Amino acid sequence: MTVFLHHHPGLGPATKSERPTFMGKLLVHITSGPEAPTRAALGLLVARAGMDEGHEVSIFLAGDAVQLIRDAVLDSLSGLGTGSLRESFDAIAGGGGHFYVSGMSSKARGVTEDDLAGKPAELAMPNRLVQLAFDADRTFTY
């Protein structure tokens, strides 16, 4: 039996008592980097919204998006209508979200373990992205 719960988006985020007891798994795959700040920030905003709704959220950064894990980028980048990267990142990190950062893309762009230090993040290879996608209930790509 499948039960669908609907929350009217015009009423703001669902309160804790309105959330379904089942927590879904959400994967947000971001490939847009500092060259596309609105799209990059939108990916993190959607991940944050998923966390606010009570879902388990994983974010996989690949391609140019690996640069988003750097503090200088987090602190300086905002999207048009999608907010500050730092605010969304901090909310995700504080809420138990986890970041996977493409090891191959990182190597090509000079992102190192030092850039991940103190963050809920780890370097990952493409097979991890495939595993996350098959484990997720829903996947969004930005």
Give residue ranges: language-model regions.
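Short internal beta-strands
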Residues: 57-62, 99-103
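Short, flexible loop segments at the rims of nucleotide/cofactor-binding pockets, characterized by
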Residues: 75-80, 116-120
